[in-house]
C-alpha cells in the first residue's frame, strides 16, 4: 500500500501545526508501518519558490527544499524508511520550472517578461495546452541531459526507489489543443523511454509512474516498456 505525503499536513497535531519538517515525519514511521504501508510517495520537495507550496513550482532540482529540512535529514528519513521496509518515491516536476530557475534567468526577455527565443532549455510558449510557468523543451539535448543527470543524482545520492512524473503529457514539441493533446505522440514516447532507460540502468528495481492520461495505444506502449 502506498500513501502520498505532504509533511506539513501529516505532522499536524490537533489545532497546532508541528514544525512540518522531514525530521518530524521520521518520528511517525512506526505508525505508518502499522497501517500496512510499504511505500511512501513524497510530493515535490525539490527546491521551490517560497516556503508554503505543494512543490509544483520547482526552481532548483539538485537541492531539497530547505523549508522541510537539511540534506542529511532527508537522507535519514529515506534510510529509516528502508529499515522499516518502506520504499520512498519522489514526485518530480520536469514539465516546467519557475522564472527563478537559472536556465530561465540566463536567457530571459525582460521586455516581454518571458523566456527568450534563443533559450536552449525552455519554450517561449508551450506547444501544448498545459502551460505552467516556463515550459521545458524535452526535444532539446540539453534538457534531456539535465533531466537524466537529475534522475541519476536522486537515485544514487538520496537512494529514492522511484518517481512519479508530473504532467508527462506535456513532454512534447508537437502543437496540440485540449481535444488533441491525448492523441498518440511517438516523439513523447521516445522521450519517456529515454528517461526510463536512465532510471532502469541506474537502479533496475526503481519504478517510474507517469501522470499521463493519454490514449490507450500510447499508454500501452509505455506500460510494455516498463513504466506505470
List each model region and its residues:
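Substrate-binding/active-site clefts of carbohydrate-active enzymes
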Residues: 4-159, 167-184, 195-203
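Conserved alpha/beta catalytic core and glycan-binding cleft of carbohydrate-active enzymes
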Residues: 159, 185-228
Amino acid at each position: 500500500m502506498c500513501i502520498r505525503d505532504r509533511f506539513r499536513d501529516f505532522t499536524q497535531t490537533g489545532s497546532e501545526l508541528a514544525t512540518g519538517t522531514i525530521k518530524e515525519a521520521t518520528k511517525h514511521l512506526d505508525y505508518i508501518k502499522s497501517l500496512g504501508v510499504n511505500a511512501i510517495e513524497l510530493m515535490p520537495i525539490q527546491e521551490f519558490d517560497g516556503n508554503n507550496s505543494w512543490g509544483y513550482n520547482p526552481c532548483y532540482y539538485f537541492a531539497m527544499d530547505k523549508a522541510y529540512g537539511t540534506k542529511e535529514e532527508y537522507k535519514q528519513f529515506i534510510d529509516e524508511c528502508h529499515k522499516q521496509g518502506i520504499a520512498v518515491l519522489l514526485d518530480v516536476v520536469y514539465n516546467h520550472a519557475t522564472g527563478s530557475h537559472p536556465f530561465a534567468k540566463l536567457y530571459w526577455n525582460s521586455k516581454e517578461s518571458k523566456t527568450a527565443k534563443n533559450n536552449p532549455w525552455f519554450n517561449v510558449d508551450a506547444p501544448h495546452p498545459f502551460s505552467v510557468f516556463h515550459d521545458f523543451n524535452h526535444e532539446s539535448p540539453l534538457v534531456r541531459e539535465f533531466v537524466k543527470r537529475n534522475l541519476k543524482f536522486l537515485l544514487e545520492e538520496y537512494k529514492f526507489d522511484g518517481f512519479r512524473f508530473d504532467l508527462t503529457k506535456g513532454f512534447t514539441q508537437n502543437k496540440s489543443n485540449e481535444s488533441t493533446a491525448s492523441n498518440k505522440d511517438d516523439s513523447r514516447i521516445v522521450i519517456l523511454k529515454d528517461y526510463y532507460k536512465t532510471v532502469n540502468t541506474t537502479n533496475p528495481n526503481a519504478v517510474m509512474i507517469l501522470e499521463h492520461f493519454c490514449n490507450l495505444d500510447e499508454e500501452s506502449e509505455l506500460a510494455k516498456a516498463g513504466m506505470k
